[in-house]
């Protein structure tokens, strides 16, 4: 049995086992589908460099992981940092934002161990019709399938 990617999925890197794991993860997270990447770094870089478009706005916590920062840097979207876990500052920025708004946070911040206020973030995202993107890399496993699933908030997020 092959382990890991043997190349790009288009050419030779897709396998039945990969698709089984994706189906399993989608089921466990109660979402329509899941997509595996070779690492969390490539997942964040790929997402933020390709999904938000010119005219959109990405609002990211100032303590967000480097992989998100790198993906955001490659994006054509407008980029704004908000103070760490400061929901009032985030709301002030959302009021002035344009296009589709993406709020980027980590559920468990890798550098200092802080938790994102996920319930408050879901309410703010709903209020401003924003898309909340949660990096669960440091919570997955330690908190089961992550804090989003543990708090039963998975239907309010685009990416985990």
What are these regions (language model features)?
Residues 2-39:
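Conserved N-terminal alpha-helix of the aminotransferase class I/II PLP-enzyme fold
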Residues 10-14, 66, 87-88, 108-112, ...:
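Short, small-residue-enriched loops and turns at beta-alpha junctions
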Residues 47-66:
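Conserved PLP-anchoring active-site segment centered on the Schiff-base-forming lysine
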Residues 54, 74-76, 128, 156:
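Short, structured coil segments at secondary-structure junctions
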Residues 80, 84-134:
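Active-site phosphate-binding strand-loop segment of PLP-dependent enzymes
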Residues 129, 148-160:
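Conserved active-site segment immediately N-terminal to the catalytic lysine
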Residues 130-144:
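SF2 helicase catalytic motif II
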């Amino acid at each position: 049995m092959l382990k890991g990617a043997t190349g790009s999925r288009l050419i030779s890197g897709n396998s039945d086992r990969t698709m089984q794991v994706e189906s399993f993860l989608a089921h466990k997270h109660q979402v329509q589908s899941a997509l595996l990447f070779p690492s969390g770094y490539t997942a964040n870089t790929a997402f933020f460099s390709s999904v938000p478009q010119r005219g959109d706005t990405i609002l990211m916590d100032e303590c967000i992981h480097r992989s998100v920062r790198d993906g955001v840097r490659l994006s054509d979207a407008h980029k704004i940092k908000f103070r760490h876990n400061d929901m009032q500052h985030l709301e002030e920025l959302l009021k002035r934002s344009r296009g589709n708004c993406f709020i980027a946070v980590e559920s468990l911040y890798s550098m200092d161990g802080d938790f994102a206020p996920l319930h408050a973030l879901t309410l703010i995202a709903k209020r401003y019709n924003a898309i909340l993107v949660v990096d669960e890399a440091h919570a997955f496993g330690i908190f089961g399938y992550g804090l989003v699933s543990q708090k039963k908030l998975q239907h309010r997020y685009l990416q985990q």
